[in-house]
A protein has these predicted regions:
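A short, solvent-exposed loop/turn motif at the edges and junctions
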Residues: 672, 691-695, 761-788
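Extracellular beta-sheet/turn segments enriched in Thr/Pro/Gly and aliphatic residues
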Residues: 786-806
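Acidic, Ser/Thr
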Residues: 830-838, 944
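Short, solvent-exposed loop/linker segments at the N-terminal edge
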Residues: 817-825, 933-943
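Proline-centered linker/hinge motifs at extracellular inter-domain junctions
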Residues: 805-809, 842, 925-926
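Short, acidic Ser/Thr/Gly-rich low-complexity loop/linker segments typical of extracellular
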Residues: 726, 736-766, 787
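Beta-strand/loop edge motif enriched in small/polar residues
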Residues: 25-448, 453-531, 535-624, 628-635, ...
């Protein structure tokens, strides 16, 4: 908008135009009543001129200030018309505008003075009046086309160098726009006093256009700016070089508090590719994108956020399907290497499906204060990350998420300059993850809580998985292989590294790995340091580095008295082949408590080396495991190590060595080719319960003075009467000739008493003791008997008591004591499990303190009725139900509080009775209702 100096002739010419302008409409054509079309060839149009019913422009037309097409009028602009606009001039459309430009001969709207004009404005009165704009070019305007509640149809519109906005929509405008081109919005500005410069297409205040085909090039602020509850459908969009504003975020697409649909979109070389921001909570934001490509953005490819980052009531504000983001912060960007993230989601929710992030100089995807309203499905991140920038080194950076978990379903990350995933203080869920060929760890979880189902982590330079200070983590179906070959420390070389993962015992928040296979690591398969309450199940470690223990634990760094816990292992299969003359253990545990179930080891190794010293004196266990290796088993500093079902395999060529340990094993089986030698130092004791094929004759010379090996067995006592019926609650006393104290107990309801794990023999460095002799005495109702057994194996003792006829045993099932039933409701009476030691017939009497004999209240013959029983059946103990109103048999029980007494007698006259209290009462109704969505714990219904 250059201001040029004027010659005197020019000044007189302008004055002449001002004088003659009021008479411009007095053309002879204006007085021709038969001709409704006025042609202006050329014509100068000033402030006071209004269009008549129908006006046609052609040739060159000059608009010096404003021109208005009244509400019932139409302005037609012919092909090749050149409209010269004065400074600030604007054409107002309140009626109909028809532009008949062609591709070969478009209509042009240009500045005539060197100062920018205000273009065309459609007011709301023009809505539905059929305005059509074909092949129009607008140059050097402040605004190109402005709409207030209008809906023109536009084909092939080109807008060059608009200062503020190319197309500006307000008040629920709904135009149809086809083949739009806007270039250099905001690029030639004399000054800028606010942010609203350099916008290509602005859709606001509830507007809903259809845009099919648009090209935006070289804009200052935004190519597409959507705000104020607007929507519409925009497709086949291309934009490039949207950059440079210091007043507002520059972006190819900006969506604010709106709900548009954008299809087939390409954004190249912009400050930000796509920005979706929620600001006003009185409305909602939901932008939908399909088939979008964003390339060479300077800061972010896609940015989805909320203006108030402390408002955590997130919901899904953006939906992307088939999104590609390439080259963020790369050489193709306006300024390389200053990017924040290729995709950035901050304090809000979004849906991403089929997303590719490629070659970003910062992290590929960053989540900050997101939650379960964010989902990524089929996300691929390649060759991304910013070296030396913490979480931004990673392909995926997830930080500060603890409200609810975002979801990743199908995720592949490769070529990151740092970790594949860096998670810090974050909660999230994932499935079907493939993390490979990353420059550091495949996955680094720092103080995070995750649930991941199905992952492959391979060919990462450092560990496949590094978990630091993790809590409440469940990993399922993991395959971790060929990791750590770029590492220099044992921690970096491990396949999976648990690093201070939950350092204190807690009934919840455990760290778990279920069905995890770790192979071909540069170091250990699983490396654990200072971690407690781990749960490892169905673990396979194979072909990891032979110079490292495949399973390696060291908890020596935990704080005494404050930290510690137990590592839980259920199913650990190890195959390894050592190298060199010195053996490497398959399992190496140092200063840690553990519960190990189902451990198997194969290959060439030295077995198990386990130092059980731990900071809080936790006990340990190893059960159902196979011992093998050249060293077999070495146990040190175990205060209490238990177990059962362990087997010494034929491949065990070493010893079972105990140093300063107390070990109690049941059912240890020795299948070694030669009897396995047990070695105990003077501070150790071994208790073997029911050992199988364990020959201690080979071991006692290696038992140090003061150490013991006890061999123990079980005793089962069955106390019966003359009818071979087990006697419940019979007294059993057992005394032992050595080692064990006297004990006393009662039999169970079937007359059995199990007495497990009593020492039958003790071995020391001098050999074995004699076998222990046990004396068993049983008694009931002043009748007793006794016998003796030698505890050299499991023993079963049948103790017979010749009793007199005994009272029956009353076993009352229903109704339970203090039961409450509805008024006149059914009540079942069942004591059919009652029985008699002498196999006598039993008689049952049911009595209520209110109604008397309950069975006597039953009326009817008991034939063909629903219960199919008689009063005699009830007396014999058959269960029955009152208040059922069967046609042929009715038993009644009135409302009120009843004391029910049951007496059971045998035919010898021995009786036993019991009383219970029940109540039949007319109760208030119970209201049960379901609410969707579910209410909060405070019974609040929150509707999003």
């Amino acid at each position: 908008m250059d201001i040029k100096s004027r010659t005197p002739f020019g000044i007189w010419f302008v004055l002449f135009l001002l004088l003659v302008t009021p008479f411009a409409g007095l053309s002879p054509f204006a007085f021709d009543s038969d001709e409704s079309i006025v042609e202006l060839t050329p014509q100068s149009v000033g402030d006071s001129v209004n269009a008549r019913a129908q006006t046609t422009w052609s040739g060159t037309v000059s608009v010096t200030s404003t021109y208005t097409v009244s509400v019932f009028d139409e302005l037609i602009i012919s092909p090749c018309t050149n409209i010269e606009m004065g400074s600030g001039a604007r054409i107002y459309i309140e009626g109909r505008l028809t532009i008949e430009g062609t591709i070969a001969c478009p209509v042009t709207l240009i500045s005539s003075t060197g100062s920018d004009h205000d273009g065309i404005q459609f007011n709301s009165s023009s809505n539905n009046r059929g305005s059509i704009l074909n092949n129009l070019s607008i140059e050097d305007s402040i605004y190109g086309v402005t709409m207030y509640g209008a809906n023109p149809i536009i084909h092939n519109l080109t807008i060059l160098n608009p200062d503020r906005v190319g197309i500006d929509m307000f008040s629920s405008s709904s135009p149809l726009i086809y083949d739009l081109v806007i270039n250099q919005a905001g690029r030639v500005l004399p000054f800028q006093g606010d942010w609203r410069y350099g916008l290509g297409l602005s859709i606001g205040s509830g507007s809903t256009p259809l845009v099919d085909g648009a090209i935006f090039t070289d804009h200052l602020t935004r190519a597409i700016n959507i705000w104020g509850g607007s929507g519409g459908v925009l497709r086949n969009l291309v934009m490039s070089n949207i950059s440079g504003s210091s007043w507002a975020i520059s972006a190819g697409v900006w969506v604010e508090d709106s709900q548009p649909l954008l299809l087939n979109l390409s954004v190249d070389r912009s400050d930000h590719g796509i920005v979706v921001r929620h600001i006003d909570d009185s409305g909602y934001t939901r932008a939908v994108f399909r088939d979008c490509t964003v390339s060479n953005s300077m800061y972010r490819g896609v940015y989805v956020d909320k203006e108030n980052h402390s408002n955590y009531t997130n919901y899904e504000t953006a939906d992307f399907t088939n999104l590609t983001v390439r080259g963020t912060g790369g050489e193709g960007a306006k300024t390389p290497n200053i990017a924040f993230a290729a995709i950035d989601v901050n304090s809000t929710g979004a849906w991403f499906e089929n997303t590719l992030v490629d070659n970003s100089t910062s992290t590929g995807v960053r989540l900050y204060y997101a939650d379960s309203s964010t989902t990524f499905r089929n996300l691929t991140i390649r060759d991304s990350g910013d070296p030396g920038q913490g979480p931004h080194k990673a392909g995926l950076a997830i930080t500060w998420i603890f409200t609810s978990a975002p979801v990743f379903d199908g995720l592949e990350i490769s070529g990151s300059v740092g970790h594949g995933i860096h998670s810090y203080k974050a909660e999230w869920q994932g499935s079907d993850l493939y993390l490979h060929n990353n420059s550091e760890n495949g996955m680094f979880l720092d103080y995070s809580s995750v649930q991941i189902e199905g992952s492959v982590l391979e060919n990462n330079s450092l560990s496949g998985l590094h978990m630091l200070d993790n809590i409440d983590t469940q990993l399922t179906n993991f395959t971790v292989q060929y990791n750590g070959f770029g590492g220099t420390t044992d921690e970096e070389k491990a396949g999976m590294f648990f690093d201070r993962s939950k350092t204190v015992t807690h009934p919840q928040l455990d760290v778990e790995c279920f069905t995890c296979t770790v192979t071909h690591s540069a170091g250990s398969g699983i490396l654990i340091r200072d971690s407690a309450d781990l749960w490892l199940s169905d673990i396979v470690l194979a072909e990891n580095d032979p110079n490292h223990a495949p399973f390696d634990v060291d908890n020596s760094g935990l704080t005494l008295g404050q930290q510690g816990g137990v590592i839980n292992i259920d199913g650990l299969d190890i195959h390894t082949e050592r190298s060199g003359a010195s053996g490497t253990p398959a399992v190496n545990i140092s200063q840690a408590a553990a519960r190990i179930h189902s451990l198997t080891m194969s290959g060439n190794h030295s077995g198990i080396e386990w130092d059980g010293q731990n900071h809080n004196d936790y006990s340990s266990e190893i059960s159902n495991s196979n011992f093998s290796g050249t060293g077999c088993v070495s146990l040190t500093n175990h205060l209490d190590l238990s177990g059962s079902g362990n087997t010494v395999s034929p491949s065990c060529s070493g010893t079972i060595q105990l140093i300063n340990s107390q070990v109690n094993w049941s059912a240890l089986t020795d299948l070694a080719l030669a009897s396995t030698v047990l070695q105990l130092d003077s501070n150790s004791d071994l208790h073997l319960h029911q050992p199988v094929n364990v020959d201690l004759n080979q071991s006692y010379p290696t038992i140090a003075s003061g150490a013991t090996v006890d061999v123990a067995y079980d005793i089962t006592v069955w106390v019966v009467n003359n009818n071979t019926n087990g006697i419940p609650r019979a007294n059993v006393d057992v005394s032992f000739s050595q080692f064990e104290p006297v004990m006393q107990d009662l039999t169970n309801t079937l007359g059995y008493l199990s007495l497990p794990n009593f020492i039958g023999q003790r071995w020391t460095n001098t050999g074995s003791s004699s076998y222990t002799v046990a004396t068993i005495s049983c008694g009931y109702d002043s009748v007793s008997n006794s016998t003796t057994v030698t505890i050299d194996q499991d023993r079963f003792v049948n103790c017979v008591l010749p009793l007199e006829n005994q009272a029956p045993f009353l076993m009352w099932a229903t109704p339970v004591d203090l039961g409450v039933f509805i008024s006149q409701g059914p009540v079942e009476f069942n004591a059919s499990d009652s029985w008699d030691l002498d196999d006598d017939e039993l008689t049952f009497t049911w009595t209520s303190d209110l109604d008397g004999d309950i069975v006597a209240s039953c009326t009817g013959q008991g034939q063909g009725n629903g219960q199919g029983i008689t009063q005699q059946d009830m007396t014999n103990g058959v269960p029955f139900t009152v208040n059922t109103n069967y046609l042929n048999m009715g038993c009644q029980l009135s409302d009120g509080i009843h004391v029910i007494t049951l007496e059971v007698c045998d035919d010898a006259g021995h009786c036993v009775s019991e009383s219970r209290t029940i109540e039949l009462v007319n109760q208030a109704p119970t209201i049960v209702f379901d609410v969707t969505p579910a209410m909060t714990p405070w019974s609040e219904l929150v509707i999003p």
